[in-house]
Amino acid sequence: MNRKQLANAIRALSMDGVQKANSGHPGAPMGMADIAEVLWRSHLNHNPQNPNWADRDRFVLSNGHGSMLIYSLLHLSGYELSIDDLKNFRQLHSKTPGHPEYGYAPGIETTTGPLGQGITNAVGMAIAEKALAAQFNKPGHDIVDHFTYVFMGDGCLMEGISHEACSLAGTLGLGKLIAFWDDNGISIDGHVEGWFSDDTPKRFEAYGWHVIPAVDGHDADAINAAIEAAKAETSRPTLICTKTIIGFGSPNKAGSHDCHGAPLGNDEIKAAREFLGWEYAPFEIPTDIYAAWDAKQAGASKEAAWDEKFAAYAKAYPAEAAEYKRRVAGELPANWEAATSEIIANLQANPANIASRKASQNALEAFGKLLPEFMGGSADLAPSNLTMWSGSKSLTAEDASGNYIHYGVREFGMTAIINGIALHGGFVPYGATFLMFMEYARNAMRMAALMKVQNIQVYTHDSIGLGEDGPTHQPVEQIASLRMTPNMSTWRPCDQVESAVAWKLAIERKDAPSALIFSRQNLAQQPRSAEQVANIAKGGYILKDCAGQPELILIATGSEVELAVAAYEQLSAEGKAVRVVSMPSTDAFDKQDAAYREAVLPAAVTKRIAIEAGIADFWYKYVGFGGRIIGMTSFGESAPAGELFKLFGFTTENVVKQAKELLA
């Protein structure tokens, strides 16, 4: 079978899919078809009949706009992606959305489209592979042994996140990571030399990568030799620089930006079919080409061989094998619920007035002993975020058995790498930075929410309570923006008990990211009944109450809860009927049934004050237009925290004053 014709099947399906949708990007799939054919048919270990086989190679299309490439590959290889699915490219509720989306079609390892994040996810997958191998492989038993392959274009390399990720990949010596640069010299605006003239091979050599330059991306033998050389280099990641022609096969549009992001048109597709010698109708693939592409039997054989290896491992190391299966399945330890409930009860029984960032570290200490799957990290702020605990061990190029990654000052890279670790499986990953600097990482957290993957972020120094560092470091609008992100769970605890509950729920939440927001300054622990402790998980609960119906409700989060309690005590002493609601997680509260929400915030009680050292406007949903909000309406200032809280109205006196005005 002629390899060019096998690659032309990808080109034809890509042209046809984009044309039928009247939307899409045919250029990259047509340009990378030869590379994809060699990789997928001669090297990629995968099983179309079990896309979740734990030791499969991972393939990431970082230049996700070229999605017809991966859809064509999955269809031709025998995954459950039909020709009708390809005909439904970019249509509502299809398995083939405009950019590849995790969870839609089997075999899609990650959602890509925002350029640079796919290569970064791939770095995370390669870290996970290296760490799992170091933790579980034994002499003569390599049960974790797979490659991560990634296709990326000029756009990925222009994005700053590619520097963050590829720099760290070199430092960590990710020898099982192999990236293909689609060096076609074209972007949306035209020829890239006017805005992208880097010496990319030297750039990657400087990162510590193994670089294979100047590979003809349309020569199957050259591509194959490059992949063999890349696989043989086990101590460094490899960049294969493939020179390609965008839109290869299109006689009048190849090599130009005209074929990047628009259908070729019926006349040009007809001309391309003639140029390529492709004599078949749109979406028609002859049986001999299907047969040559079909990977089902080979994939099943590869997985069966691995099953035999794993059976031998399980016989020699039964405890490790059981633990590996538990972790890859994403199951928590059997004693999890009992142990964590006891930890939380003990915290309530032994009050401590500590910063919630310290409470977070204590939770890591307690829960970490139960979770060998923890994979922590921080963007060069471990002593401030307090993300290391006594069991933390640094993961390095020389020893990947560690459970803590020093990400350096790479917030965006860290967050997207964690997405890759989560997608790979076998770990409960978390990262950390100051809340203000989640701004650098926002799109990766959005991607975690979109993909519904577990990415736990610890965001400390959560308000003007940061003090002297000033408004560049003081978050204002960040908490609200996290809360408004669909499928994100955001927690701002008020003491060590709420902090531990937030951590417990984040660890249990496998289908979404969590943002855990902690203070720099010490916070008073609140007394609670067992019922109140249980209600923390509901996101909002009655912390202090009056006899009968309240005339005023104070709603507060985090460091402002003790302020609400102090105001409650003063107002109660003056005979006012006041309730305090602690609301560490608005999204968790919003998910409760109507009866519970009414019990906490009765509709009849319209006099409400929300108190939070974050943007004020967020709270109208809970206080109504008749309520009041003590919050931020501007950026902060540089001064000691106590002075700032006073300046911006976060004092008992101001809360009491506002309450009395509302009750008057």
UniProtKB/Swiss-Prot annotation:
Site features described as Important for catalytic activity, chain residue numbers: H25, H260
Any Pfam family the entry gives: Transket_pyr
Enzyme class, first EC level, given as a word: transferase
InterPro entries: THDP-binding (IPR029061), Transketo_C/PFOR_II (IPR009014), Transketolase-like_C_2 (IPR055152), Transketolase-like_Pyr-bd (IPR005475), Transketolase_bac-like (IPR005478), Transketolase_BS (IPR020826), Transketolase_CS (IPR049557), Transketolase_fam (IPR033247)
EC numbers for this chain: 2.2.1.1
Positions annotated to bind thiamine diphosphate: H65, G113, P114, L115, G155, N184, H260, F437
Residues bound to substrate: H25, H260, R357, S384, H461, D469, R520
Protein name: Transketolase 2
